[in-house]
Amino acid sequence: MFTAYLILCPIIAVVLVGLNWLLATSNSYIEKDGPFECGFTSFQQSRSAFSVAFILVAILFLPFDLEISSILPFVISPYSNGLYGLVILVIFLILLIVAFVVEIQLKALQLNRTYTNDLPHTELYDININD
């Protein structure tokens, strides 16, 4: 039963995406592709630049968050895991610590911000990873 579920779900997903691609109407024009500002056409750049540091922290947070959530099954049932589960957990934590040390050595977490104002109405930061 579970095998049929694993086979049927991707097939249904591909069929639905294919039907959407075939039947959907594509009517793009400049007002539809641009940002919405209360129905008025914007006269200047309405999108401000994101800080690269914000995106970098978000990208670095995601793998560590997923790895920490992988520890939860051991925390919930430590007595039924036994010695084998403990060894796997220790190996997993060692790999996590080694990855964190490598990120520190590559200076991926050190953000050296130098403000550049080459373009009007934007804030760009040059992040130097290798000093």
Curated annotation (Swiss-Prot):
Main location: mitochondrion
Catalytic activity as recorded in UniProt: a ubiquinone + NADH + 5 H(+)(in) = a ubiquinol + NAD(+) + 4 H(+)(out)
Keyword entries, A-Z: Electron transport, Membrane, Mitochondrion, NAD, Respiratory chain, Translocase, Transmembrane, Transmembrane helix, Transport, Ubiquinone
A molecular-function term among this protein's GO annotations: NADH dehydrogenase (ubiquinone) activity
Its EC number(s): 7.1.1.2
Keyword Phosphoprotein: no
GO cellular component, one term: NADH dehydrogenase complex
Broad class of enzyme this protein falls into: translocase
UniProt subcellular location: Mitochondrion membrane
TM region(s), chain numbering: 4-24, 52-72, 82-102
Entry keyword annotation includes Transmembrane: yes
Matches recorded under InterPro entries: NADH_UbQ/plastoQ_OxRdtase_su3, NDAH_ubi_oxred_su3_sf
Membrane topology of this protein: Multi-pass membrane protein
Role noted for this protein: Core subunit of the mitochondrial membrane respiratory chain NADH dehydrogenase (Complex I) that is believed to belong to the minimal assembly required for catalysis. Complex I functions in the transfer of electrons from NADH to the respiratory chain. The immediate electron acceptor for the enzyme is believed to be ubiquinone.
Family: Belongs to the complex I subunit 3 family.
Protein name (database record): NADH-ubiquinone oxidoreductase chain 3
Organism whose genome encodes this protein: Candida parapsilosis
